[in-house]
Design a protein with these regions (language model features):
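Leucine-rich repeat
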Residues: 1-6, 24-33, 52-60, 79-87, ...
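Amphipathic alpha-helical scaffolding segments comprising HEAT/armadillo-like alpha-solenoid repeats
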Residues: 2-3, 12, 28, 39-40, ...
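Inter-repeat linker/turn residues at the boundaries of leucine-rich repeats
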Residues: 8-11, 35-38, 62-65, 89-92, ...
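Conserved hydrophobic beta-strand positions in leucine-rich repeat
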Residues: 13-18, 40-45, 67-72, 94-99, ...
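Leucine-rich solenoid repeat scaffolds
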Residues: 116-160
Length: 160
């Protein structure tokens, strides 16, 4: 993946769909560090066995600063990865974040309820995570999430 991420063929890309490719944390790190992806607006990495390390690398990527949509659904991202994404200083243009079917629990929900780093985010998908009653209340009471176009969870009274 590291060689592919450095390929000149990646340079003109605005969209990259790499779902179901076993990218893993190392592959996510290679993409995050790739200097060839500076034009990327849409990145789909669902079902790739990406965990917290990969999510942290993507959140800290200066290369992906133009990203508007990030799909990390059906991976292995937990609280640490969710916190890094929610507090990212580099994904300022992100409008859509798909984190459905991961392993995000209460700590991750707390960070996502605040979304201190993703000021332009309008759509957040958190369906099929480890949302308990306390996490549900955090999401429901979040002023930041109430301002968004859509927040998707497994619960019909939160988001839509």
């Amino acid at each position: 993946m590291e060689e592919l991420a450095q390929s000149e063929f990646f340079e003109p890309l605005k969209e990259l769909w790499m779902y179901e490719n076993l990218v893993g944390d190392e592959g996510a790190k290679a993409l995050a560090e790739s200097e060839q992806l500076t034009r990327l607006r849409y990145l789909s990495l669902y079902t790739n066995r990406i965990g917290d390390e990969g999510a942290v690398a993507l959140a800290n990527s200066k290369t992906l600063s133009k990203l508007e949509t990030l799909d990390l659904s059906f991976n292995r991202i937990g609280d640490r990865g969710a916190e890094a994404l929610a507090n990212s200083k580099h994904l300022k243009k992100l409008k859509e974040l798909h984190l459905d079917a991961n392993r995000i629990g209460l700590r991750g929900m707390q960070a996502l309820a605040k979304l201190s780093g993703l000021q332009n985010l309008q759509i957040l998908n958190l369906s099929y995570n480890r949302i308990d009653l306390q996490g549900l209340e955090l999401l429901n009471d979040s002023k930041r999430l109430q301002e968004m176009s859509a927040v998707k969870t497994d619960y019909p009274h939160i988001g839509g």
